[in-house]
Amino acid sequence: MSAPTNWNDLKKDITRRMDSAVEVLKKEFSGLRSGRASINLLDPVVVEAYGQTMPLSQCGTVGVPEPRMLTVQVWDKSQVKAVEKAIANAGLGLNPQADGQMIRVPIPPLNEERRKELQKVAGKYSEQARISVRNVRRDGMDTLKKMEKDGHISEDEIKKHEKEIQAITDETIKKIDEALGHKEKEIMQV
């Protein structure tokens, strides 16, 4: 995409890219096991089925009947063992149990040490998101300076727009911090 040449396009681009960083963070957080069942917990699971590897979502439907239980309704009875094996070997510390075409996956409670590890990982994810946001801010400031140099905006407008970019940045960082606080609380909940 070419660099924006007016303030409205630049503002839209900055907002879109910063919002994208927050969405990526939330997706990463959804993959962190917090001791509670979440359908996203099984997103990284890939199944060896029909001579190829495929995501679990293409083999069955994941459900959350209870806070500490996931279920996988496997569509093809012949693939139940493959799905069960894929969940067990996914490195998530889960122990699936097949019951006909339904696989039950109890979510074990996290010990204190594992909770602290997950908090650190969540902190790293949020720091990566903050870095992305700061990079977008820097790109926006650089583009503003280029727009001034090219005669698209005045020096007074630059000052005003720099403040707006900073306000968007601050708001996005606040969203990241709120998401981190929520995830840490979820992780530490026993």
Curated annotation (Swiss-Prot):
<comment type="similarity">
    <text>Belongs to the RRF family.</text>
</comment>
<keyword id="KW-0963">Cytoplasm</keyword>
<dbReference type="InterPro" id="IPR023584">
    <property type="entry name" value="Ribosome_recyc_fac_dom"/>
</dbReference>
<dbReference type="InterPro" id="IPR036191">
    <property type="entry name" value="RRF_sf"/>
</dbReference>
<dbReference type="InterPro" id="IPR002661">
    <property type="entry name" value="Ribosome_recyc_fac"/>
</dbReference>
<dbReference type="GO" id="GO:0005829">
    <property type="term" value="C:cytosol"/>
</dbReference>
<dbReference type="GO" id="GO:0043023">
    <property type="term" value="F:ribosomal large subunit binding"/>
</dbReference>
<protein>
    <recommendedName>
        <fullName>Ribosome-recycling factor</fullName>
    </recommendedName>
</protein>
<keyword id="KW-0648">Protein biosynthesis</keyword>
<comment type="function">
    <text>Responsible for the release of ribosomes from messenger RNA at the termination of protein biosynthesis. May increase the efficiency of translation by recycling ribosomes from one round of translation to another.</text>
</comment>
<dbReference type="Pfam" id="PF01765">
    <property type="entry name" value="RRF"/>
</dbReference>
<dbReference type="GO" id="GO:0002184">
    <property type="term" value="P:cytoplasmic translational termination"/>
</dbReference>
